[in-house]
Amino acid sequence: MGFATRTALRLIFSKKKKTFINFLSFISIIALSIGTAAMIVVLSVYNGLENTLKSIYKDFDPEIKVEKFESKYFEDTYKEVISGIENISEVSSIIENKVVLQNEEKEVVAYLKGVDNNFTKQNRISKNLTEGRFIFNFDNLDYGVIGRGIKYSLGIRTNSDFQSIKVFSLNEGKKLTPSMTQQKMYNEDFLKTAGVFAIESGFDNNYIFTSLGFAQTLFDKKNYISSYEIMVEDKENIEKTKEKIKGTLGSDFLVLTDVEQRAGLYKILQTEKLVVYFVFFIVLFLSAINIFFLLIMM
């Protein structure tokens, strides 16, 4: 008879069997309690992270965004039609594209976002200003509102009378050839800095806001936009509103809610939560099975 078998038989028939089983039961219950508490804490952290991300993106992303399939720009002729749909409070015309920003010898690549007056009324960016004001025109001069990261990268001084940002945009309307001069390859203009916003580094390092007219002229896209950004009156009915917009505009347009605009990120969070559920389920299941068999042995 092996050592393991003799030890097992002694435990089974020993007077100390009950005490030993009680000890194992206590350990199993402790493990089960710790596992349950850990699962609650971890899931609470994930839920808190998700809510935090939603609150951050809420200031930057619209509740509904409309873009055109297979086309970067489209004519700004649908605004009134969309505005007439039930549950819509604001419709903003937006044009956005990559640009190069230059201040003296410093340069950064960023997204220039041209917005109309309706966007300004929504107060989404202006409430996150750390310096200056959210204005785009003053004394016949064009202004931009930049992210804090761009300010540091370019060494910008807000509201300086002597400092302007030089903005370059690739001339997409012309075919590039080796003989083209830089002047023909790029459209360029100047912006003064009206304010600085701080939301999240991904936005702060990459975005500059200005007027719709300035951006359309720079991109050589007069009367064209890249998207509509829409705010709704009742968020509970956002899916119904989205479907109405799709029905009105037709299949040529892509209509996304705020969650769908960040679908990849939220999908990762949900996947991680499911993995956590699965791991803790296995731990709790094994602990529960252990307790069950210990109770049978008592």
Task: Give the positions of each predicted feature.
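N-terminal Sec/SRP start-transfer signal
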Residues: M1-A37, E50
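Basic-flanked hydrophobic alpha-helices used for secretion and membrane insertion
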Residues: S160-D252
